[in-house]
Amino acid sequence: MKLCLTFLLVLMILASVTGEKSSKHTLSRAARVKNRGPSFCKADEKPCKYHADCCNCCLGGICKPSTSWIGCSTNVFLTR
């Protein structure tokens, strides 16, 4: 009987450590946050100082979408 209870306890701990039961909850929460978007970023065409100020990129002091395949680049040839 003790062996059976110990085995069940080990299974419960193992499931909680590996995230078996919480994976669906975590994924659904991540999807909701992604759809809502960050609440602290500025939309396109707003003034900015850093890339982190914008939802996309800060180029020339204005939030703009990235036009390069490598992300927010300030190189003239990559931002056209």
UniProtKB/Swiss-Prot annotation:
Record carries keyword Secreted: yes
Modified residues (4-hydroxyproline): P38, P47, P65
Gene Ontology molecular function: any one: sodium channel regulator activity
Keywords: Cleavage on pair of basic residues, D-amino acid, Disulfide bond, Hydroxylation, Ion channel impairing toxin, Neurotoxin, Secreted, Signal, Toxin, Voltage-gated sodium channel impairing toxin
Location of this chain's protein in the cell: Secreted
Post-translational modification: The natural D-Leu form of the peptide is more potent than the synthetic L-Leu form.
Its biological purpose: Iota-conotoxins bind to voltage-gated sodium channels (Nav) and act as agonists by shifting the voltage-dependence of activation to more hyperpolarized levels. Causes circular motion, convulsions, copious urination, rigid paralysis and death upon intracranial injection into mice. Causes unbalanced swimming, swimming in diagonal and vertical motion and death, when injected intraperitoneally into goldfish. L-Leu and D-Leu forms are active on both nerve and muscle.
Domain statement: The cysteine framework is XI (C-C-CC-CC-C-C).
Similarity comment: family membership: Belongs to the conotoxin I1 superfamily.
Protein name: Iota-conotoxin-like r11c
